[in-house]
């Protein structure tokens, strides 16, 4: 027995009655297969962020950052189902181009109609874009490392995705978005993902204030990553997932998708080499693993808005410029006394801006055309003698930056004025560590006595003894380290260069 499909897809609502209409006939199955695989690949970036952030933190906060990445995925995916997708990608924004309607509230009617910006069905496009939302949320939380309460963090993330991420996603990716109509180009999220997460994390860090550090009370706290192995593994996951992140943003399985993957890999390689070489000459003639990983991620951030628009050779320039620019931004952060402990702003905020400007310079009409009939033509950037494009890119940067900083600040300050939504841990909790104070579990149990307990016991790990010494300081923070040799110091320098 088989279905008797006699209906024709309507292109509206659900796309037609699935009992009488084969909704798949209007779509290319190869395109759907590729974007489905890419959706799963993008999600791998979420635990990659968790491993990266956890490795860069101190041991007593390591589990909380793994927890935060998975929590961000859960909160963002629910928010995307609840109303996020509708606010960003509803087919009808009622002409405002600023934010969508509740047309798809609770995924109502999200099924087989063509999505607003691609030849994919709504349901598949919603899945793919939901992974982008999860990655953005996980990245942004890096600004709160080692000093934020976790329940207010969850509340903040849900609200931030609603009033910051979704409007900007509508501006840059919805067919009716005002930046789309202006002519601003953002292939895979230089503005929507990286600028918003970087500057959102910056505001979070500023409002929380710097971490308590009895050794450097007047200076900025600096700590060595407790696990460079986790940093490397997280970077591996991110680089792997980024190929799906940028390759899938083509929206189809055309030459443009594979072209953008090659550009992505080349920019990552050049960014990593640039950062590592800069650190080698600045910091005691030692090769730094954390610097290499930071540069790779900076290169990936820089190519994100550009990958499907620019020639492959320009990925070398984008990787080098973004790697160098983000490296310098880490120093700027220290000069401005901003305790952005995981460099969310220095790499994602700054890197997203650099990549967006370079997109306006290197965008080429012939690269965009490799998607064939699936894409609308563009005028290109400076290399096509379309000099207005950089102006359009700057307009997008200024608008997204102003909205992100203003709305995030208002949201966090309002929450912090509500007693049960206070943002920051107490001084005692911060000294104990977020893992013990807020979770009651630990990444490493070597300092605790083992007592068998059922898996659902109220306390699933023993409380560690109080810390007698300040742990994980980098060179220059303790008297013992002041007497270290230059070669000893160089092995620990600049480990605050992080994503």
Swiss-Prot record:
Q: How is it modified after translation?
A: Phosphorylated at Ser-457 by the TORC1 effector kinase NPR1 under nitrogen-limiting conditions which causes a conformational change in the C-terminal region (CTR) to form an open active conformation. Supplementation of nitrogen source leads to inactivation and instant Ser-457 dephosphorylation via plasma membrane PSR1 and PSR2 redundant phosphatases.
Glycosylation (residues): 4
Q: Which residues lie on this side of the membrane: Extracellular?
A: 1-31, 84-122, 174-187, 252-257, 313-315, 368-393
Pfam families, per the entry = Ammonium_transp
Result after altering residue 483 to Q? Does not affect glycosylation
Q: Cite the GO molecular-function annotations of the record.
A: ammonium channel activity
Resulting phenotype, residue 186 to E: Decreases the affinity for the substrate
Keywords from the named record:
Ammonia transport, Cell membrane, Glycoprotein, Membrane, Phosphoprotein, Transmembrane, Transmembrane helix, Transport
- GO process annotations (BP): ammonium transmembrane transport; nitrogen utilization; positive regulation of filamentous growth of a population of unicellular organisms; pseudohyphal growth
List, as start-end ranges, the regions of compositional bias called Basic and acidic residues: 468-482
Q: Which portions of the chain have biased composition (kind: Polar residues)? A: 483-493
Q: Where are the transmembrane segments?
A: 32-52, 63-83, 123-143, 153-173, 188-208, 231-251, 258-278, 290-312, 316-338, 347-367, 394-414
- Quick one: where's region Autoinhibitory domain? 450-485
Q: What happens when the gene is disrupted?
A: Impairs filamentation induction.
Query: Where does it localize?
Result: Cell membrane
Region of interest: Linker domain? 442-449
What membrane topology does the annotation report for this chain? Multi-pass membrane protein
- Region: Enhancer domain; residue ranges are 428-441
**InterPro entries in UniProt:** Ammonium/urea_transptr, Ammonium_transpt, Ammonium_transpt_CS, NH4_transpt_AmtB-like_dom
* PROSITE patterns cross-referenced by the UniProt entry: AMMONIUM_TRANSP
Major location, coarse class?
membrane
Q: Tell me where on the tree of life, at the top rank, the source sits.
A: Eukaryota
Swapping residue 348 to A leads to an effect described as: Preserves transport activity while impairing the filamentation capacity
Cite the domain annotation text: Within the cytoplasmic CTD, an enhancer domain, limited to residues 428-441, upregulates substrate translocation via the MEP2 hydrophobic core, while an autoinhibitory domain, comprised within the 450-485 region and including the NPR1-target serine Ser-457, counteracts the action of the enhancer domain. In between, a linker domain, limited to residues 442-449, appears required for optimal activity when the kinase is present but dispensable when the kinase integrity is altered.
Instruction: State its role.
Output: Transporter for ammonium (both charged and uncharged NH3 and NH4) to use as a nitrogen source. The affinity of MEP2 is about twenty times higher than that of MEP1. MEP3 has the lowest affinity. Under ammonium limitation acts as an ammonium sensor, generating a signal that leads to pseudohyphal (filamentous) growth.
Q: What is this protein called?
A: Ammonium transporter MEP2
What species is given as this protein's source?
A: Saccharomyces cerevisiae (strain ATCC 204508 / S288c)
